[in-house]
A protein has these predicted regions:
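Sequence-level preference for short, compositionally simple segments enriched
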Residues: 1-330
């Protein structure tokens, strides 16, 4: 185990003044586990982590004490005259196995998606990835769970760090996290399990835009999560829509706020995908026990949304979803 400490430049207690400097100084042997302890502060950095077996943990009392912050956005024009686009807008890009982020805030500060477009906070394309007690903040496209779909809809649409990489599924586990945004703010093709998380809609839009590949058993599973509104009007958001035709999103024992539309999910105008997507719920319940009738219209779900029974729901346990071929159990 190799341990490093990062602290703001004025704090002499840190071995490194930035995460980027710490990344550059990690042991070359990728099998050596590295823990980076990050002292409280705001780190204005755009980061790429390509080394496996790394744990990065905030040393503050809460994740809001240690913030990794940047503000790139999709509509920004690059020096070559081309828009930055979605996949070059990230604050933190992780492309390595066995990485854990703990007690951190990762944010994209670009702001309003109407004027700035897509702005990724965390771009995670990796296997056996864990985010524990983290805040992941943005607006449109806050969290990308790679890989990318096989093909882009428009030329140059996937321009970014993994546009030419093999499309290899990875498993990701988000526990006790706060994730916010407005449009498609959790999206991608990974197998990702969200447990005990707060998923906050900042305005009208869609929480998920899964692109689960055809034949992949699992996409997104939300267990014991809270779908909350922070400035989003009643019935103005959907749990998800299919970025690709085989999207898979399952909710189990989740609290649903009144901001979620009675239909639950949207088909993105893809009526042909009604028979190929898996959008399903088990024991969804209203966030507030005494809320108005408007937040409990689960009988009004779209006809392509399934209700699971207990036996079906058991198939989506954390143990099964994340096991893979190596029996991983975070």
């Amino acid at each position: 185990m190799y341990t490093m400490t990062v602290a703001p430049g004025a704090d002499a207690s840190g071995s490194f003044y930035s995460l980027k400097a710490a990344f550059a100084a990690m042991p070359e042997d990728p099998t050596v586990p590295v823990t980076i302890r990050v002292m409280p502060g705001i780190y204005h950095e755009k980061l790429s982590l390509m080394r496996p077996n790394v744990t990065i943990e905030g040393a503050g009392a809460s994740p809001s004490d240690t913030v990794i912050s940047f503000g790139d956005y999709g509509y920004e024009i690059m020096p070559d005259g081309i828009k930055r686009g979605t996949f070059r807008s990230y604050t933190f890009f992780v492309h390595a196995a066995d990485v854990t982020l703990r007690n951190l805030t990762i944010e994209n500060t670009a702001g309003d998606s109407k004027t700035h477009g897509q702005a990724i906070a965390l771009y995670a394309e990796c296997d056996r990835f864990i985010a524990e007690s983290c805040r992941i903040l943005g607006h449109q496209d806050t969290l990308f769970t790679g890989p990318l779909p096989p093909e882009e809809y428009e030329p140059g649409g996937f321009r970014g760090p993994t546009e030419s990489a093999p499309r290899i599924n990875g498993r990701q586990y988000y526990h006790n996290c706060y994730i916010c945004g407005d449009i498609d703010f959790i999206f991608g093709s990974a197998t990702a399990y969200f447990e005990g998380c707060t998923i906050a809609s900042l305005g009208p839009g869609y929480v998920t835009a899964a692109s689960t590949p055809e034949g992949q058993e699992y996409g997104y599973v939300f267990h014991d999560c809270r779908f909350a509104a922070e400035g989003c009007p009643q019935h103005a958001a959907y749990i998800g829509r299919p970025w690709r035709d085989y999207a898979r999103v399952v909710l189990m024992d989740c609290a649903i706020g009144a901001h979620i539309h009675p239909a639950g999910f949207h088909d993105w105008g893809k009526e042909h995908a009604h028979g190929t997507v898996l959008f399903a719920e088990y024991h969804s319940y209203p966030q507030d026990a005494d809320c108005a009738d408007g937040c409990r219209p689960f009988a009004q779900r779209a006809d392509f949304v399934d209700t699971l029974d207990g036996a079906q729901a058991a198939h989506f346990s954390r143990e099964l979803v994340l096991a893979g071929d190596d029996g991983w159990l975070p």
